């Protein structure tokens, strides 16, 4: 993961947003397998649980196994075929999501060697808002930022 580019700016921005809105007393369910940002959250005092690589499009049981007070999905919803069902199965009342916004000139990203490293959705901001609204979530804070990959 991140062999060629490490997303320092995105991680710093995401951590600042997390620290602004979430206490380190909370337990976070971070959607996806343990990753570099999971480690950053832990290094900053957060208790982090992760899913274990199951196909969340067809099986959301991982969201029921452990108790958590915050659900995070950082740069992962674009990989799911069915983020609607995942959002319906979240078992807490705090949610933090980040997504790469769709650029009008870019095709969906697709790795030819890793089936988990593919984008099914390329969201526009209104589409994420609609998805959250349809699944009963209320947006209370948001930030948009750029993440230049080559810098």
Locations of regions flagged by a protein language model:
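A short beta-strand submotif of the Rossmann-like class I SAM-dependent methyltransferase core
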Residues: 70-76
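Short, glycine-/aromatic-enriched active-site segment of Class I SAM-dependent methyltransferases
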Residues: 97-121
């Amino acid at each position: 993961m991140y062999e060629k580019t490490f997303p320092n700016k995105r991680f710093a921005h995401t951590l600042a947003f997390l620290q602004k809105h979430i206490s380190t007393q909370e337990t976070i369910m971070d959607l996806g397998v343990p990753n570099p940002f999971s480690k950053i959250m832990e290094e900053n005092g957060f208790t982090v649980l992760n899913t274990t690589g199951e196909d969340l499009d067809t099986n959301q049981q991982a969201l029921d196994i452990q108790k958590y007070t915050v659900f995070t999905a950082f740069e992962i919803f674009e990989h799911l075929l069915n983020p609607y069902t995942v959002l319906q199965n979240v078992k807490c009342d705090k949610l933090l999501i980040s997504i790469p916004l769709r650029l009008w000139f870019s095709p969906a990203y697709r790795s030819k060697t890793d089936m988990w490293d593919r984008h099914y959705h390329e969201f526009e901001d209104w589409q994420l808002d609609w998805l959250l609204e349809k699944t009963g979530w209320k947006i209370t804070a948001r930030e948009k930022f750029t993440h230049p990959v080559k810098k």
